Amino acid sequence: MHAALLLGFGASALNPYMAFAVIDKLVAKEEIQLDYATAEKKYIKAICKGLFKIMSKMGISTIRSYRGAKIFEAVGLSEELSNAYFGGLRSTIGGIRLDEVARDAIAFHDAGFAAQVDGLLPNNGLYAFRKDGEKHAWNPETISTLQLATRLGSYKKFKEFTSLVDGKEAPIFLRDFLDFRRAPISIDKVEPVESIMHRFVTGAMSYGSISKEAHEAMAIAMNRIHGRSNTGEGGEDSARFTPREDGTSLRSAIKQVASGRFGVTTEYLVNADEIQIKVAQGAKPGEGGQLPGFKVDQVIAKTRHSIPGISLISPPPHHDIYSIEDLAQLIFDLKNVNPRAKISVKLVAESGVGTIAAGVAKAKADLIVISGAEGGTGASPASSIRYAGISPELGLSETQQTLVLNGLRGQVMLQVDGQLKTGRDIVLMAMLGAEEFGFATSALIVLGCVMMRKCHQNTCPVGVATQNEELRRRFHGRSEYLVNFFTFLAQEVREYLAEIGVERLDDIIGRTDLIIRKPENESPKQSLISFDKILARVDNGAAIRHTIDQQHGIDHVKDVEMLHAAAEALENQKEISLEYTIANTDRACGAMLSGTIAAKYGEAGLPEHTLNVKFKGSAGQSFGAFLVPGVNFKLEGEANDYLGKGLSGGRIAVLPPVRSNFQAEKNTIAGN
C-alpha cells in the first residue's frame, strides 16, 4: 500500500531503506534461512505483486499510467490539508488539519518508545474482534443478541440488539453521526410490515463460497417474505427452479452475471426475476470472485460448469464491457433473453461513482446497486478490507445527486448495501436516496455465523461458509430465523416512519432535508467532519425517486418475427427452416427466441436440428447470443461483436457471401 500511494502521487523510484535494514538484521541473526541478496529479491517481488494487484483493480497496465494518477480519495482529511499537500485530492467530508497530524505523530512516537517491547507486537484486532483492540460493529455481544432474538422470535430482544448497534459508545460509520427530524403520527397510518419487506434483498454470496444449507435457507426466507435472494456469481442448480411439494421455493430471484460467467446459461437467466451485472463489489472493488479449488466439489463444479478441485477466479473486468456502450449491449442482450426480469448493475461506492451511475442509467439499467466498503469482507484480501472502497453513505449520496442533476433518477431504482443492521440504518439510507436495501453479513450471522474470518479456508466452524461435510453438519440455521429478522427490521422501520411523521417509506426517499447531525458531544477531531456535501439536495424539479420504467426497445426485434414463424417448432418440436435478411441494426438476434425455448424446455432445449434459420446480410451485435440446443443459425455475410455470446448449446455458422472474392486470411467476418 505504501508503495502504491507514493507512486500514485508521482514518485519515480522508491528506496525502502528501513525494510532493507530489517531484512539485513534478520539475515544476520539467522531468523530467516536465506542470504541477504535472495531475501531482498523476494521482498521486492512481493512488493511488485502487490502493485500489480492494485493496478489491475483500476484497469491500469503500465506503471507509467499509474504514476501520478492519484486514484485515491481522502476520508477524514480537511480540504485545506488535501490542497496543500496532496494536490487537491478529493475529500468529501473534510476532517483533520496539519495540527492534528502533528499531534498524532508525536503521540505515536511517544507511545513507541514509552516501554520496552517484549518481542511480539500486540494484536489490535484490526480484522477480527479482540477485547481491548479496535472497535467492531459486529462483536460477541451484538452477534449473540441478534442470534438469540431471531431464534426466540423476540422483538424485545431485537430492540436490545438495535440499542447496542445504534447506541454504541463511539461512532464507527458515518451514519452514526446522523439523526432525523421527528413529527410523530399514529403508527396505524404507516404502511404494513409486508410492504416494507419487499424492499429487502440478501447479498450476492455464491453457492460454493457458502454452504448449500445456508444458500438455500436464504432463498426460502426471502421467497417467503417476497423479498429477493441472490445466487452470487456461482450459478444455481436447476433443481431449485421448481417449487417443492410443500410449496417452499429454493429459487434465488436474483441471478448474478459476473466477469467469470460461471453457471450463466440461458436456462439460468430465464429463471430470474432480476438479472444483476456485477461490475464491482464493495469489499474488494476491482477484484473478481475467488473460490479456492479445495472448496470446488463435484456438485459446485457441475453448477458452475467447471472441473472439481480447480480454483475458480473471476477476472477483474468483464471481457465484453470496456465502455458504457458495451454495458448497454449486455443489458439489451439480457433483457431480450428474459423480458420479465429487471436488469440491475452493481457498482462500488467510490469517488466518481455518480458519473458512472449516470452512464449506467443511460445504458437502460432498471436498478443500480451501490455497494459500500464495510460489508462482505469474509473472504476478501486483507488489503482490500482496509484500504479499498468507501462508505455507502458517500457513494449513495453522490449517485443520488448526480442522477437527479441529470434528470435520470426517475427511471432507475437505487439499492444500497454495506453493514446495514437496524431500522435506523434503513431510514437514513432511504433519506440519502435508496429504495431497496441489501443484507449479507447480518443474514449470515442470523443463520449462525460467528465472524471467525475463515470463509476462504473452508474451515467455518458453524457450517455457514464451508463445503466440508463434517462441518456442514454443524449448521443449525433455519429460514424462520431470517424471516424473524426481516420482520423485526420492517417493524422497526414502521416505528421510525411514525416518529418522522410519514405514512410510506417512499415519502422519505431522497429527503436529505430530514437528516440532522446528532447534537451529542464529539471529540475535537470528530467536530471537524462536515456533512454538507453528503446532505446537499439538488432542487431542479426532477424526480428524486423511481417513477417510470426504462424503455428497452425490445418490442420490435427480429426475434418477435421469428417466434411467430417458428411457433410450430416451439409447440410441437416440428422441424422448420426459415430465411431472413439481416442488418447491423438487428442486435441480439436469437436471444429472445432462445429464452422462450429455455423457459419451456429447460437446459435440453429442442431436439437437434429442429429450428434452422438462414440469414443474409450484416448482423448486428450479439448475433446468436445465448442460443440453445436444437437451434441452428447460418449467416451468409458478416457479424459484429459478441458473436455467440453465452452460447448454450445452439450452433452458429458464419460464411462469406457466396459470390464474394475476398481473401479469407486478409478479411474478418466476425467481431470479437
Can you say where each PLM-predicted feature lies in the sequence?
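Catalytic alpha/beta core domains of metabolic enzymes, predominantly
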Residues: 27-56, 64, 385-387, 400-409, ...
